[in-house]
Amino acid sequence: RAVWLTTNYGLDWPRNRLSHEQQKKELISILDNLKKWNFNTVLFQVRARGEVLYDSKIEPMSSLIVGNPGSKEKFDPLAFVIEECHQRGLECHAWVVTYPLGGDKHVRSLGRSSVTKTNPNIVKKFGNEWYLDPGNPRTDDYLLSIVKEIVTNYDVDGIHFDYIRYPDNRGRFPDDDTFKKHGKGMKRDDWRRDNITRFVTKTYDWVKSEKPWVTVSSSPLGRYRALGRNGNGWTAYETVYQDAGKWMQLGKHDALFPMMYYKEHLFYPFVDDWIENGNNRILVPGLGPYQMIELGWSKQDIINQVDYVRKKPIHGQAYFRADNLLSNTKEIMNSLSEYYQFPAKLPALTWLSDEKPTEAIDLRAEKQDDGIFTLKWDEPKESNGNRVTYNVYRSEDEELDINDGQNLIA
């Protein structure tokens, strides 16, 4: 049960005119509501178009943070949101927009700190927008340095890649020189797909070598490949060179959140196609409640999709974006609350280890001065210094069913 919490342009958070203290209160309110509605995963946008929302030595802090009135104190949004998420039992995944860098005006606003100035050899201008060049191996190194900075310095639960693809206008990206230098005799379409797969592989291998519990995921286009008459025109594989199914088959992704912001014949067959290509790893369709505003979808359009995916071997739902849910557009949350009455367990990364979870040691109830009992326990010895999380269950019966969501309280 995930949401994309969008910081680009302050769409979900933060509002540019607020002080840091007000921004913190606003973010806490969002997280409190997600917890109240029994969500468990926040995809928090930490990088968008060459600027970031954490303390970085590589890229500049977002102007939405540094440009606020009364902002003399140092504020690290990623550190703050991780702490607040974990206090509420929410996972926090660092959402990283990969290749797009923005238009001329945005790039100029970053001055000499823009990657177009610090690393001009790995960028391309396409139309009115700047992009990192996926075909240049040094682009991999640059993006991986950002991932390393985040994973090393922050207790994130996941790294989540967005726009991990070529721009939409197929074949026109100006990479002739890069292809000539690095193409290795491949067809250009295959070479472009291989470029992104190469970066995915490098990143996954590094993350798992450092913090194997950190989930590596991405949000590819919602239609993997053209299926007969369905989905022609804009697909991940054919149009923007995302071979996301291959990433799963190679074991270089833990999860996919395909952006399935379509209806009917452009939705249902593609859910099944993702299942076929998911390699039994975590698959979480991204649903688009924002379409109720932009395209006039009914609430029932979203609910029908939730019904469908919950009957499939799928591991949850994600929603774009937070405000479209929490503002209760067309009373969507009233309906979703019937599905999310109780907390839900997160799927385990069973391909990393098939060991069963260990029990807490020396579980005890201690009575406090106010008469309240506090549960306490010791960390399992098997943790070996790794971060440990717990599920807490409660039942009034002697037999406790851990598969019954009503018994999961924290």
Name each model feature, range by range.
Residues 5-7, 214-233, 270-305:
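Active-site clefts of carbohydrate-active enzymes
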Residues 6, 10-25, 83, 93-153, ...:
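Active-site-adjacent "subsite" loops/lids of carbohydrate-active enzymes
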Residues 10-21, 60-75, 126-144, 185-196, ...:
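The substrate-binding groove and active-site-proximal loops of carbohydrate-active enzymes
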Residues 37-73:
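Aromatic-lined carbohydrate-binding/catalytic grooves of carbohydrate-active enzymes
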Residues 39-40, 47, 79, 88, ...:
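Polysaccharide-binding and catalytic clefts of secreted carbohydrate-active enzymes
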Residues 244-267, 281-353:
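Substrate-binding cleft of secreted/luminal carbohydrate-active enzymes
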Residues 331-386:
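Pro/Thr/Ser/Gly-rich low-complexity, intrinsically disordered linker/stalk tracts
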Residues 387-410:
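Recognizes extended acidic, P/S/T-rich segments that occur
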